[in-house]
Every structure is written in structure tokens, then in C-alpha cells.
A protein has these predicted regions:
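Short hydrophobic beta-strand segments in globular cytosolic domains
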Residues: 133-134
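Short, tryptophan-glycine- and acidic/Ser/Thr-enriched carbohydrate-recognition patches
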Residues: 48-64
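An acidic-aromatic loop/edge-strand motif
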Residues: 139, 148-203
Length: 203
């Protein structure tokens, strides 16, 4: 009798996000073929740095991210729906956590537009290619890893009041662009510090 054939493997569910290898850097997200629509969803993967030690000074522009961790959003602590919960003891939590995603937009038109919707809990500074484009609930002046958010923001408020930002066209370039966010707690033992971001484009 002929050898039995193995059962066919089911096709992957296109709605299931791919889980990257935790031991390899997160790949650049290629959206060069997308003409319009959302390209970063809640639940997608981000590089993150959640150590009390500050990352490389060029973390938001050109720094190598191979030593960073990565996981699905939302990321942080205090949110039971977190895709990547930060489970370290409260004493080891950092005031500031850093999040990065590199995106290949391909060739850009003069009218190319990117819009971000950011969850801010408690404060945040948002960058594109190393240039600050928005700070929310943060003090003026120089920001560093020990800078606290200006006030506490509850998790429910953060989830329901996303901050919308249109990225200045002059900051975007052909090829790979870096979207980066630093999230700041209002105090060391804040009950929640979480990050999430969705983004859309129009060519």
C-alpha cells in the first residue's frame, strides 16, 4: 500500500499577527506598496527599551536596535489588555520607556502624508527621524530619562483620548523612516504606564 500522505497544513490566518523571533532584531516594516490606509495597528510589534539606564543618545534616529527587546502593543504595566506587559517589580520600573519602529515608505510624493494616533500615559515625546514633532503632558526644556510627566493620566483617559499628530512632510524621506516615542511616568510608582500607536498614510 502507498505510504499515507501527511494531512495538509492549514493556511495561515491573515488576521493573526506574525510573532517575530525574540532573539533577532525586529525587521523594517515595508509599506512601500500601500497607497493609503493604516499601516501600524494596535497589536503590532515595537522595539522597546524599559531599563532605568538611558538608551543610546541617537535611539530616535540612527542607533542600532539589536540589543533592544520587542513585543506587541500595547506595552507597559497596569493594563490587563497589554500585548507586552512589563512584569518587573515596581522598584525596578523606569520613569521613561522608549519605543521605536522603522518603516520603509518607498518613494514619496510631494503630497505624501502620515498621521499618528498615540496613547499617552502619562506623558510622551514623539519623534520622526530624530526630530521632535510633539510633546504631550511634558514640561518645556530638555527632556531626559529622569524627566517626569507633568501630571498623572489615568489608563481609561489614555485609552479614550488618543493624541492625533500629522507628521510634517519635510521630516519624511524616501526609504526607511524611524517613528519613535518616549513615554514618561508622572511618578515612580504610577499605577499604569502604557504605550500604543496606530498610524495611517496617504500617497
Amino acid at each position: 500500500a502507498p505510504d499515507p500522505q501527511p494531512d495538509p497544513q492549514p493556511a495561515p490566518d491573515p488576521n493573526t499577527p506574525l510573532v517575530p523571533d525574540p532573539d533577532k532584531p525586529l525587521e523594517v516594516l515595508d509599506v512601500s506598496a500601500l497607497n493609503f490606509g493604516t499601516f501600524l495597528y494596535s497589536g503590532m510589534n515595537w522595539n522597546y527599551w524599559n531599563s532605568k539606564e538611558a538608551p543610546d543618545a541617537k535611539w530616535n534616529s540612527t542607533a542600532d536596535l539589536s540589543s533592544w527587546k520587542h513585543g506587541a502593543s500595547p506595552l507597559g504595566w497596569g493594563d490587563r489588555d497589554a500585548g507586552t506587559p512589563f512584569t518587573m517589580p515596581a522598584a525596578d520600573r523606569a520613569i521613561t520607556n522608549y519605543f521605536v519602529r522603522d518603516v520603509n515608505f518607498g518613494t514619496l510624493s510631494a503630497d505624501f502624508e502620515v498621521t499618528l494616533d498615540v496613547r499617552v500615559d502619562d506623558g510622551a515625546v514623539i519623534y520622526v527621524n530624530g526630530t521632535e514633532i510633539k510633546r504631550v503632558n511634558m514640561p518645556e526644556g530638555t527632556i531626559d530619562a529622569n524627566t517626569r510627566a507633568s501630571s498623572n493620566v489615568g489608563l481609561t483617559t489614555a485609552k479614550n483620548k488618543l493624541v492625533r499628530i500629522t507628521v510634517p512632510r519635510k521630516l519624511l524621506k524616501d526609504g526607511v523612516n524611524r517613528i519613535a516615542v518616549e513615554s514618561h511616568a508622572n511618578y515612580a510608582k504610577a499605577s499604569s504606564v502604557t504605550f500604543d500607536l496606530t498610524a495611517s498614510l496617504v500617497r
